[in-house]
Each structure stands twice: as C-alpha cells, then as structure tokens.
A protein has these predicted regions:
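Secreted, disulfide-rich extracellular signaling modules
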Residues: 2-10, 14-278
Length: 278
C-alpha cells in the first residue's frame, strides 16, 4: 500500500509538470482573422465654410399668409458674430377720419409691442438699446425671378428718419416704450389732409388693398438698430401692436386717430437680416 501511494503521487506530479510547460515557441503559430485595419492619409485643406440654416420667415411673398412675427435689433456673440435685423412694413387708416378744422394737432407717436422672444443681455446692468424709425423712400421691389419673395439680404429703401428712442431691455420698460415724432412738415401735412378728407384716407372698393392710395402716398416704415445694441427683439405683427397715433384736441377735449399695420395684404412686409461672422 505504501508503494502504491508513492507510485500514484509520482504519476500526479509528472502530469502537473507536463501541464505547466513554459515553452512559448508555439504562441503565434496560428493566424488570427482580423477584419479591422488602420489607414493613414494626408489631406491638404484649402477652404472651409459654415452653413447656416435660416430659422426665420423673412417674407410671405406676394400671395402668402401673414407674418405674425418679425425681428429688430443687433446681437453679437463669439460663435455667430454680429447679427442685425430691420423690419419693414406698411400702415393704413383704420377708418375714414372726421376731424374738424378747429382741432389742433398736439403730437404724433408710433407704438410697437415686443414679442415673446428676446436674445441678448437683459440683466439689471443691460446696455440701453437704441432704435430709429424711418419712412420708406419707395415701396420695396419684388424679386420676380424668385417667385415674388423678399429675401433676408434684400435692402430696405430707407428714407427720412422720423424718430429715435432708447430704453433698457426689461420687459416692464419695453411695454411702455414708443417713438415720438416731431411736429414737422410731414405730420402737419398729414393732419391737414385728414381734416380735408383727402382721397388717400378713403377706402378703395375696386382694389385688393382698401387703402392703396394711402400706401402710394406713405410707402411704409422701417426700424433700424443702433450700432452699440446687443439685443435682438421680436416684434408682434398685428394691427393693435404696430400703429402711428395722432394726438389732437379741441378746447379741453382730447382725441386720437390711428394708422395701423396693414393686415389685409402684407406682401410688402419683410425684414432684412445681416450677419458678419466672427
């Protein structure tokens, strides 16, 4: 029995030594299939560019539906550079005026309502924003080669400056901001035309635009941003949010008459957008 245990022990030891053989010469003898590979190429990059997808409807075209929102102002950041936006639109009478010759003109104001969207610095130390109101020198010209649309780079036919306003871009402040026009030749003449019941204030039954004669006389308005502005503001494009108001009186009685945003046909309304990359 002693010899049997000894023989069994020697057999186990021999098998253990054989299984622990450290001969490495057999490693790597078999080929392993590999579907991956590394390829190195050298390319000379000559030009690069950035493609920007337009996120704003800048024009409804001659037959499109109304634009409900435009943008105005100037905004600068380190990624997209400097972006400026200037809206262009028309105003028309809301009714035929009935103003007696005894009434005297006090002032003329232009009111606008900032929409929901604001880009830029609106903190307590925000930079005052400056906007200037211009009269259009002529009606914008359609791009007949592009389906009668205006594009974001189409220039605005700037005319005379009518007023300037500066304000801090805080919501409560902006809700009370308006332009105050000077009592000059233009406003005095328009008020006199109202008193004389001039034909431009009468609706045209045979035209697609009721007050087409008025638009031929007063081509429209545009708003320009100051060069130091740092906010882009949305602008509500509805008649009750964009209007020119004439303030006048007779004795102790005060009155107003409004020229509001054209909503019947708005093909001449668009806004110009420019971007200077960083």
């Amino acid at each position: 029995s002693y010899y049997m245990r000894l023989i069994f022990f020697l057999l186990i030891a021999t098998l253990g030594l054989y299984s622990c053989n450290n001969d490495l010469t057999t490693i790597g003898q078999d080929l392993i299939n590999n579907g991956n590979h590394i390829e190195v190429q050298t390319t000379l990059l000559k030009e690069t560019g950035t493609i920007k997808i337009d996120s704003f409807i800048t024009s409804s075209g001659r037959y499109g539906s109304a634009i409900t929102e435009m943008f105005m102002g100037r905004y600068k950041d380190q990624y997209s550079g400097v972006t400026t936006a200037s809206p262009c639109f028309q105003i028309v009478p809301v009714s035929r005026p009935s103003i007696n010759f005894r009434y005297l003109l006090d002032s003329v104001t232009f009111h606008f309502k900032v929409g929901k969207n604001i880009w830029g610095d609106t903190t307590e130390t925000a930079t005052p924003q400056t906007l200037s109101l211009y009269r259009l020198a002529r009606l914008p010209e359609f791009r007949t080669d592009q389906n009668d649309y205006f594009y974001n780079r189409d220039s605005i036919p700037w005319g005379d400056k009518l007023a300037t306003v500066s304000f801090i871009p805080k919501r409560m402040i902006m809700n009370q901001v308006y332009f105050k026009l000077e009592k000059d030749t233009l406003t005095e003449r328009m008020f006199a035309m109202m008193q004389n019941d001039d034909p431009i204030f009468r609706p045209n039954s045979n035209s697609e635009i009721s007050y087409y004669k008025f638009i031929n006389y007063f081509k429209g308005l545009a708003i320009q941003s100051g060069k130091d502005n740092n906010c882009l503001l949305s602008l509500e494009m509805i008649p009750d949010s964009l209007y020119m108001r004439f303030h006048y009186h007779n004795a102790d009685q005060k009155y107003t008459y409004d020229l509001k945003l054209l909503s019947q046909r708005n093909e001449y309304q668009y806004f110009n957008v420019k971007n200077i990359p960083s």
